[in-house]
Amino acid sequence: MDVDFVMSNKTIRHCLGLIVLSWTGLASAASISVEIRQTGGGFDIQGSYMSPLTQCQAYVLLTDFSSDEPSEGIKSSKITRLSDQTIRVEQKVEDRFLFFTTKFESIIDYTEYPMRGMDLQQVKGYFKEYRGSWRLIPKEGGTLFTYQAFILPESSIPMFLIEHFMNNRVQQRFEKMANRANRKKDFIPERCQ
C-alpha cells in the first residue's frame, strides 16, 4: 500500500512538472499575438509581443539595423542614413518555400521616433506596397512591442505562397524577435545607462 502511495506521489509530481512546463510554454506563446486579415486586395497585419526589456533597451534592439545576428533569407544588407530620423535599408533576400525559391531586392525607409518606435515604407521590393509601424509601449515588467502593417502583394505571386508566408512566417518571425528580446534582457546598451 505504501509503495502504491509513493508511486502515486511520483506520478503526481511528474504530472505537475509537465503542467508547469506546459503552462510556461503557453505563457510565452500567449505573450505573442499576430492577427492577419485580407483587406483591399492585401493583408492587414497586427502583432505584438511582450519583452522584459526597458523602453530604452527595446528601442536600441528595434533600431539595430547592423546586427551581426543572422536573419533568415537575408544575403546582404546596406544601411544608409538619409537624415537624423530616416534610415534606408537595402537588402538582397532569398526565400524558399517547398520547391520555390524567390530572390529579390528590398529597399525600405525607416523613420525613427526615439524611444517610441518607427514607421516603415517600402521603396522597392517584393510587394506592390508595404508600409507599417512599430511602437514601444512601456508596461510593468518590460516593454510591449506592437506592429501594424499593410502589405499589397504583386499579382504575379501565387496566392498559396502569399497565404503560407502570411500564416506561418509572420508568426515565426515574431517568435524569433521575442526570443531575441528575451536573450538581450541583461544587456544594457551604453546609451541606456
Q: PLM ranges: what are they?
A:
Residues 4-16:
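Bacterial N-terminal signal peptides that target proteins for export
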Residues 29-84:
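Hydrophobic ligand-binding cavity/cleft-lining segments
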Residues 24-26:
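N-terminal signal peptide c-region/cleavage motif recognized by signal peptidases
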